[in-house]
Structures are given as C-alpha cells and as structure tokens.
C-alpha cells in the first residue's frame, strides 16, 4: 500500500482509530495515541498497563516517553514485608498506571491536537462495549489528563481494592507523582544501520512475554511531515478487576519481602518495548519497525509490522509479515 501517510497495528480497534486520525489531517503521534486510547476503551486492561511511546522526525532526533507501570508506595514507610511462606495478597502486586501521563507529555511534545480529541476514540469504544465506568474514566482523562487519576472518583475505588487495607502498597501520593517520563531515544547500531529505540528496550530475546501482561500490541504511523511514531501496549487477561471503573489492573508490582531491599517506590517496572525507528546513513528516519507480542525486536530479520518512507519521493509503504 503506497501513500504519503500511513498507520497500522496488529489490533484492529487501534488501527481503525489511528487511520481515522491520520485521515483527518492528524500527526503520526496523534494517530498512535488515538489507537492506544481506542484500545483502552475497548479492553478493560489496557489503560492500567504499561505503555512505551517512540517518536522520531527529520532533524529532531528521537524521543521515548515512559508509560511503564510504577512501583507503588510513595509517601509511606517501608512495610515489614512478607515472609517466604506467607501468602501474598493480590493487592500487593498492583502497580501505579503511568500510560496517560506519558501520552499527555508525548502529545504536548507533538503539539498538533489536544489530548481530548484523541481520547474521544476510547470513549466511543467504551460506550460501544457497554463499559460505562471506563467511559467515565476516559471522559475525565479527556478533560483533565493525568489529573483524572488523582481525583477521588478514580482513587477511591482503586485504593479500596489495592490500598494498604487490602495488603497493597498503593497510596494517593502515587497518583500525583508520576515523573521521569521524557527521554532521549538511544541508538542501537546493527547490520550497518542505526535504530532509535527506548532506553529500556531489551536486546534480542526469544523469551515469551511475561504472562501477567497478556497480549502485546503496537501501533505505528508515519505522517506527511516525515515524523515516525510507535506505541507498544498490552492487553492483560488476568489481574485485579476494579468493577466500579470497568478496568483491570495487571499483577506487576513487586511485593515487599522481609529482609530483602524493596523496589524503590515510584521506579518504573520492566516492560517490553519491541519498537524502533531505523535511520539511513545521513541519520534521517526511514522506517518504523515493530514486533507485537515479542519482548524485543529481532534485528536480524524483517519485522512483523513496518512502515518505510523514501526521504526523496516521500512515498510511504507498509509491510505485514
């Protein structure tokens, strides 16, 4: 398929929204975020799961926005911790979502559309699925961005199930202190090519995705300005169901164990980021690559999804393998 701008995903819900956003004159960043929010409305587990956003443009280098889950426990003392033979409650494995914070920062960096205009894709999907609680959460995100997650309408049902009273670590302070989001992309030199990727992206791996993250998905886009963007997110099928919000939180946080140093509160928790942007010898981005469902890109073979752009003709071509 040949054009001047394209978007694609292994998730049909996300792909439809991303293509629609580009068709309305949107940017590559807006397209991939629209796809993410559509998925967040269509599936209960996406909004509270990890997100990686990668952006690269001509003459601007690459940026990575860290929407990985954060370890909870800000503003509290270290708990005593669980003993080796002690049952660990599900609440102790619930982490702090940072996807919306990362999306807001990436969208501000792009500056093309308001975040609310992108979130509307998710609201429509949630309403179509009959998930009224999820539609309400996304409605508040549309109005307030990350601040919506510090409002009582969100924190009260979340903390009721994942707070200290249930053996969890999450506190109100966790939702007000999502930091360290914007990073310069790192460069990996492989087979005479430079690939821009997130600093936390893994090297080639044959290991399966962590079971708690469920299905891996990506959205890729290239716009008429020559900006390349990609997001990697997840659709967990198992986790803590927060019925009042129609959301599912995956079991990713690290429980504190007695006698073992605890995971620092507020620190990002590992998550795969199988997306990269390849540059030519002049440092110009020419291809966005993605390997949905994998822990990392396999740089030795063609990616499952890719969009390439000829810097001279500006023609854009997509590939599915």
Summary of predicted features, one role per range:
Residues 1-195, 256-259, 266-267, 273, ...:
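Noncatalytic scaffold domains of N-terminal-nucleophile
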Residues 61-68, 196-199, 231-232, 287-291:
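Short amphipathic beta-strand/extended segments with alternating polar/hydrophobic composition
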Residues 70, 236-238, 293:
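A short acidic/small-residue loop/turn micro-motif
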Residues 151, 155, 168-173, 183-234, ...:
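Internal maturation/activation junctions in enzymes
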Residues 98-106, 133-140, 200, 205, ...:
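Active-site-proximal alpha-helical segments within enzyme catalytic domains
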Residues 41-56, 215-288:
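Active-site rim segments in enzyme catalytic domains, especially the processed small/beta chain
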Residues 174, 180-182, 209-212, 274-321:
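C-terminal catalytic domains of large/alpha subunits in multi-subunit enzymes
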Residues 141, 146-147, 197-200, 292, ...:
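Low-complexity, intrinsically disordered tandem-repeat tracts enriched in small residues
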